[in-house]
Amino acid sequence: MVTSSQILSTLHMIDREKLDVRTITMGISLFGCVSDNEDRLCQKVYDHIARTAQNLVRVGEEIEREIGVPIVNKRISVTPAALISGGVTHPVKLAKALDRAARATGVNFIGGYSALVQKGMPAADRRLMDSIPEALSETEFLCSSINIGSTRAGIDMD
């Protein structure tokens, strides 16, 4: 049972200490979107994200109202793009599809324009990495990352 003291303490944190929930994240697998045609891949990625996350912002806002604590960011995290883009010759197309999906759903940002190269760097990873500057300059909501090492895998020195 919640006590009066706990309620007052929470109200104090919200009012005086600006308590908030920093981020809620919806994780979406894109493995079902794989295609040997990059335009089809981009369309499938957009459609899947837009459909899956269509209610994310609304639900986040409902949670804010229900618990009385602001949620600063609503975001989407997807399968690392390099894992689904083996046949893509222009990865920026995929970046733009991700960005359009973020805009359509109303989220603050979308992560997953990423490569996991801790165990080596196939051609798809290299193409994606080379495209990051262009992708970030031509999108509004996209976040990108490169994983170069882990405790288990070590660091790939190539």
Briefly describe each language-model feature range.
Residues 1-130, 150-157:
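Metallocofactor- and cofactor-centric catalytic cores in central/energy metabolism, strongly enriched
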Residues 136-157:
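Cap/lid and interdomain-hinge subdomains that line or gate substrate/regulatory clefts
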